């Protein structure tokens, strides 16, 4: 049987909030069977739990934010992506502020931290969401589409007319597994244009942004001295974001995802469109690991 997963032990770390610029503590706590992914604001008294649920995404400008009432946990997509990449079903993510720390702008540091906690199988079947028919979300010329597929394949295309974005590196395809995610996706960093930074900071956004946690792009190219980690790092990061955004459906998805210029808001709309019609999907489990179309890292 393919079983649910959590961590063996608590892992604690800290980092800088991308938008607040403040130090943020983050703790990963093992969670119970069918508990799902839950974000907990421990800076509040009493602490407030917000489940990682697509229907609780109320803001999606530049990042995915979970909101319940007037309580928010922002910039969750990179840690959600790491959680999805390792096949973790149940986890409490404690944060000491209204956003998850940005770390180096990728999911790599979160993969490292979660692996320090050790993966632990739980005595319950892992649930998957199998897409049964095409579902799409469209905004202007942007597209996000699910279609039936025996696995989880992500195809993404960006479209930037800019010297830093070579045409041959604006599309990528990943057949999702723990191995492909960790080695081909997780280290891809977020990126932004230097010309936008002053505007963002004037609006109390990106106060923690630096070349240590993002790829900076000016009018001619990449500003970071070390350059890119991959020739197609920009589109790989969009796939990283999509993996995290789509895991907000509550379980690993079995489908093909096609994204064209899609972002957090459109990814979220796609999930809402899936949920709007129960005939779009079914919940499946696998009694035999050989039947599972998505390869995960072994739990030892």
Swiss-Prot record:
GO CC entries: membrane
InterPro entries hit by this protein: Ribosomal_Su5_D2-typ_SF (IPR020568), UDP-acyl_GlcNac_deAcase (IPR004463), UDP-acyl_GlcNac_deAcase_C (IPR011334), UDP-acyl_N-AcGlcN_deAcase_N (IPR015870)
Catalysed reactions listed for this entry: a UDP-3-O-[(3R)-3-hydroxyacyl]-N-acetyl-alpha-D-glucosamine + H2O = a UDP-3-O-[(3R)-3-hydroxyacyl]-alpha-D-glucosamine + acetate
Keyword Amino-acid biosynthesis in record: no
Domain of life assignment: Bacteria
Positions with a binding annotation for Zn(2+): 78, 237, 241
Pathway: Glycolipid biosynthesis; lipid IV(A) biosynthesis; lipid IV(A) from (3R)-3-hydroxytetradecanoyl-[acyl-carrier-protein] and UDP-N-acetyl-alpha-D-glucosamine: step 2/6
Active site (record annotation): 264
Assigned protein family: Belongs to the LpxC family.
Function noted in UniProt: Catalyzes the hydrolysis of UDP-3-O-myristoyl-N-acetylglucosamine to form UDP-3-O-myristoylglucosamine and acetate, the committed step in lipid A biosynthesis.
NCBIfam families, per the entry: lpxC
HAMAP family xref list: LpxC
Protein name, per record: UDP-3-O-acyl-N-acetylglucosamine deacetylase
């Amino acid at each position: 049987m393919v079983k649910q997963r959590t961590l063996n032990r608590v892992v604690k770390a800290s980092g800088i909030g991308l938008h607040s610029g403040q130090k943020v503590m983050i703790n990963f706590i093992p969670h119970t069977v069918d508990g799902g992914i839950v974000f907990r604001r421990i800076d509040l008294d009493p602490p407030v739990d917000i489940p990682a649920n697509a229907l609780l995404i109320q803001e999606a400008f530049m990042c995915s934010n979970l909101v319940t009432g007037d309580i928010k946990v922002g910039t969750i997509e990179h840690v959600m992506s790491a959680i999805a990449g390792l096949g973790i079903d149940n986890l409490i993510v404690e944060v000491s502020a209204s956003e998850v720390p940005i770390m180096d702008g990728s999911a790599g540091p979160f993969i490292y931290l979660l692996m320090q906690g050790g993966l632990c199988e739980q005595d319950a079947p892992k649930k998957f969401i199998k897409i049964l028919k095409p579902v799409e979300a469209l905004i202007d010329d942007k597209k996000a589409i699910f279609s039936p597929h025996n696995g989880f394949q992500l195809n993404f295309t960006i479209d930037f007319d800019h010297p830093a974005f070579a045409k041959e590196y604006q599309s990528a395809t990943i057949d999702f597994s723990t191995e492909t995610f960790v080695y081909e996706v997780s280290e891809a960093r977020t990126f932004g244009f230097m010309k936008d930074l002053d505007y963002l900071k004037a609006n109390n956004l990106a106060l923690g942004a630096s070349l240590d946690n993002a790829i900076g792009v000016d009018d001619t190219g990449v500003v970071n001295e070390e350059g890119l980690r991959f020739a197609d790092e920009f589109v790989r990061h969009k796939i990283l974001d999509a993996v995290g955004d789509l895991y907000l459906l509550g379980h690993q998805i079995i489908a093909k995802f096609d994204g064209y210029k899609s972002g957090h808001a459109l990814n979220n709309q796609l999930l809402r469109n899936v949920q709007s019609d129960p005939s779009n999907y079914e919940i499946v489990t696998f009694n035999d690991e050989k039947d599972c179309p998505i390869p995960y890292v072994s739990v030892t």
